[in-house]
């Protein structure tokens, strides 16, 4: 996953900024939100966000939709480390699982499902099967 923010700012500067943010706003998560390359969706007007940890992924997607003024009939997908996260997941959980070594969580958005893998697809189907005979 390529990030324009990473290209523009050296690692040490990014790490120092993320550390400063998490110390100053301990209930907020430093998130970088950028448009996926080759996506025909609108550019977002700002890419740095301080996101409450109790915000769901679905609520964050709503914020992105509003920032890019995306009509409700148009689709939007967000990707974190090439994965489509569950909309009910809390941003704090996603942050802990996927934050970059610099301390930021990098989110890509696109008008199409460019990576095609969801968190559910990564699970082993056998782990989800239940033997109904053993439930009795």
Curated annotation (Swiss-Prot):
Pfam entry (one): ATG8
Its cellular-component GO annotations read: autophagosome membrane; cytoplasmic vesicle; cytosol; fungal-type vacuole membrane; lipid droplet; mitochondrial membrane; phagophore assembly site; vacuole-isolation membrane contact site
The UniProt entry lists membrane topology as: Lipid-anchor
Under the GO molecular function aspect, what terms does this record hold? phosphatidylethanolamine binding; protein tag activity
Q: Where in the cell is it found?
A: Cytoplasmic vesicle, Autophagosome membrane; Vacuole membrane
- InterPro entries, from UniProt? Atg8-like, Ubiquitin-like_domsf
Q: Which Gene3D superfamilies does the record cross-reference, listed alphabetically?
A: Phosphatidylinositol 3-kinase Catalytic Subunit, Chain A, domain 1 (3.10.20.90)
Q: Where is this site: Cleavage?
A: 116-117
Give lipid-anchored residues (Phosphatidylethanolamine amidated glycine). Answer: 116
Propeptide feature: residues = 117-136
Membrane-crossing segments per the record: none
Tell me which positions the record assigns to the signal sequence: none
Q: Which keywords belong to this entry?
A: Autophagy, Cytoplasmic vesicle, Lipoprotein, Membrane, Protein transport, Transport, Ubl conjugation pathway, Vacuole
Look up the record and give one Gene Ontology term from the biological process aspect: protein localization to phagophore assembly site
Please verify whether the record's keywords include Methyltransferase.
no
| Source domain of life | Eukaryota
Q: How is it modified after translation?
A: The C-terminal 20 residues are removed to expose Gly-116 at the C-terminus. The C-terminal Gly is then amidated with phosphatidylethanolamine by an activating system similar to that for ubiquitin.
Q: PANTHER family given for it?
A: MICROTUBULE-ASSOCIATED PROTEINS 1A/1B LIGHT CHAIN 3-RELATED (PTHR10969)
Q: Which family does it belong to?
A: Belongs to the ATG8 family.
Give the protein's biological function.
Ubiquitin-like modifier involved in autophagosome formation. With ATG4, mediates the delivery of the autophagosomes to the vacuole via the microtubule cytoskeleton. Required for selective autophagic degradation of the nucleus (nucleophagy) as well as for mitophagy which contributes to regulate mitochondrial quantity and quality by eliminating the mitochondria to a basal level to fulfill cellular energy requirements and preventing excess ROS production. Participates also in membrane fusion events that take place in the early secretory pathway.
UniProt name for this protein: Autophagy-related protein 8
What organism does the record attribute this protein to?
Debaryomyces hansenii (strain ATCC 36239 / CBS 767 / BCRC 21394 / JCM 1990 / NBRC 0083 / IGC 2968) (Yeast)
